[in-house]
Regions:
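Active-site catalytic microenvironments in core metabolic enzymes, especially phosphate/sugar-handling
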Residues: 1-120
Length: 120
């Protein structure tokens, strides 16, 4: 789903790709970095019993390690890492359309940053 919708070659996953889940959370762009509090994404997952968190980007030594450790302990947790650019792109597309009528006569265009990573 995410690969198709965001035109990506790869979506990173931590956890069991086949696990069943009933609660999914989303932290787009840099929100999954914790907004100044590295522990925030883990606290959100625990407080709201989120099984799968869809993230923009992560701090690997905290969120990645937390979800990986939780999986190894048999907890139902997973992480889908879509990337900063891809998760914020829809907002940038909207912003270009929103700006056009506010500044008539000035060209406003959305420029697709595309998936910045190449995978070997």
């Amino acid at each position: 789903f995410f690969k198709e919708k965001f035109a990506m070659d790869v979506v990173q996953i931590i956890g069991d790709p086949g696990m069943k889940c009933s609660r999914v959370g989303i932290l787009v762009g840099g929100g999954s970095l914790g907004l100044g509090r590295e522990e925030m994404p883990m606290q959100v997952m625990e407080k709201h019993d989120i099984h799968v968190m869809v993230c923009g980007e992560i701090t690997e030594w905290t969120l990645c390690a937390y979800v990986n450790d939780a999986c190894m302990l048999g907890m139902n947790r997973a992480l889908l890492i879509i990337g900063h650019e891809r998760t914020e792109e829809w907002g940038m597309k909207y912003m270009a359309e929103w700006l056009k009528p506010l500044i008539p006569g000035m060209p406003v265009h959305f420029a697709d940053a595309r998936e910045p990573f190449k995978y070997l």
